[in-house]
């Protein structure tokens, strides 16, 4: 599919899947950076069936240039333009035998650095000392999510239903 086809898929269905954005070596570099994470920090959640890091890009700044590669930045620019910024970053590693269940839901909150009451924003939450708020629909309608799988993902083992 061309990027124009992907853009049409987003317009028609609300999502698209782009394969091959990262090389094996690039994915390995991201994985290696993850291995250096301090799992005792408040933004990390570690159990027998889950490893998660909230504020992922803030907690592991070495992954920023790895994730936002020239190729990914070019794709984002062509699909959405250049007027964008990150509002949330979370890493999940959920092993195959994990029984951690998350029901169908929509992520509607953005992360912000402080609580500042503004018309149309709310309700507010705080998770691991990070404020979150649901923005107005006009903002939500202009947001996009990038999901990067570091391992092989198929329709049988994929973690996202759209």
Language-model regions, residue ranges each:
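Non-heme Fe(II) oxygenase catalytic core, chiefly the N-lobe of the double-stranded beta-helix
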Residues: 2-13, 22-162
């Amino acid at each position: 599919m061309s990027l124009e086809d992907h853009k049409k898929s987003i317009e028609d269905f609300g999502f698209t899947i782009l394969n091959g954005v990262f090389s094996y070596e690039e994915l390995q570099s991201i994985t290696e950076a993850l291995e250096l994470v301090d799992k005792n920090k408040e933004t990390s959640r570690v159990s027998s069936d889950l490893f998660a890091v909230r504020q992922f890009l803030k907690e592991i700044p070495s992954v920023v240039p790895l994730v936002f590669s020239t190729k990914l930045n070019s794709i984002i620019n062509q699909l959405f333009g250049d007027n964008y910024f990150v509002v949330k970053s979370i890493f999940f590693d959920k092993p195959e035998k994990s029984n951690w269940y998350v029901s169908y839901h929509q992520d509607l909150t953005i992360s912000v650095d402080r609580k500042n009451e503004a018309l149309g924003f709310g309700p507010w939450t705080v998770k691991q000392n990070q404020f979150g708020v649901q923005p107005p629909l006009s903002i939500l309608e202009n947001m996009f999510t990038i999901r990067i799988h570091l391992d092989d993902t198929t329709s049988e083992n994929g973690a996202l239903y759209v």
